[in-house]
């Protein structure tokens, strides 16, 4: 039995979240009656309303009246009035991942997991399958620029989804093809230990059926170790690693783009196949690596070399992933979601490759607990920035932690040898500081998962206003 067509309304609590909105949009496009609520209006809510979905602002008990099922994200607390009412009325309550799993049962599925790079890799797989005439359904954790949304309903037999590991529910997802980009210590508030994180990723891959396969990056030592532990499943490895089945070679930066080739090597026959002259309109080895994962899947699904080349060359990127927001006097402003030390280091390395000028990082640390647990890593991930401007911690609902704040972070960066670190007193001061530091040819990279994206989009005009 699959999700009955007559079920509904399906009510989403927190429908404006990036993961929830994508599922709601696809369900609506499939013909289900969808409604929801969110704490505030946002761009996702506006887009859903344009599709005819009723969205209430504010969480109230009466919002769930008439609902057949209530979908909640992990951000929704047990005392939420809509959740409490649903349970009191014995309305079935399902987690976001459980509803996503129901959608995945309707198609063959590629699920992309990893601590970093999921959203970009998901978008790349979608672009390649699209180019190959497969017309996939897509549910992503970020806005795909080519679609203007994070979700689309395709007519083909495949679905491409981002598998969010943050609360462990990605283990519910029935993937036929699994990608693992990397595994780093993250979401320890849920998993408690890094060993538990690794066990979850191992289980994710082992959930793939015998007729499916997993694509895993052995440039990452933890992933390579996982490959050695997984038996009875077909694994395709990728990376610059000389032992990879799908190898990224001859990578070179070119005016904000990346040029490379990919070599496939069959372990049984030893035969090789090469796709040369690949151009990705994004800088950074991490993005080329993500593209290699997507290419590995596309090649395995029978998509031609020429279609692969064309799709990668035309890849439009993802919102908040090295997104150019504007320019002022030859200074380029970039907005990026990077908020983990590994992500920040990769973004700044890409920025360094993209300019002969200075790289000025503006960072808004996201969550006190993340800054606390990864403090040493945060203090050493800004080496490719000529200057670092540090804003207050974005709490994301957390209470402050003594000794974990902007000023201690500034001191930590200086103590670890960084030559130019400044505290940002308040957001209104950013334009003045950037004007003083930046010259033509420089890149200003705004980093964080909080509201720093608003600063990044406002900054070009604020700089122009200063003259």
Swiss-Prot record:
Catalytic reactions on record: UDP-N-acetyl-alpha-D-muramate + L-alanine + ATP = UDP-N-acetyl-alpha-D-muramoyl-L-alanine + ADP + phosphate + H(+)
InterPro entries listed in its UniProt record: Mur-like_cat_sf, Mur_ligase_C, Mur_ligase_C_dom_sf, Mur_ligase_cen, Mur_ligase_N, MurCDEF_pg_biosynth, UDP-N-AcMur_Ala_ligase_MurC
One cellular-component annotation, GO: cytoplasm
E.C. code: 6.3.2.8
Residues that bind ATP: 114-120
Listed pathway(s): Cell wall biogenesis; peptidoglycan biosynthesis
EC class name: ligase
Function (record text): Cell wall formation.
Record-linked HAMAP family: MurC (MF_00046)
Protein's name according to its UniProt entry: UDP-N-acetylmuramate--L-alanine ligase
Native source organism of the sequence: Bradyrhizobium sp. (strain BTAi1 / ATCC BAA-1182)
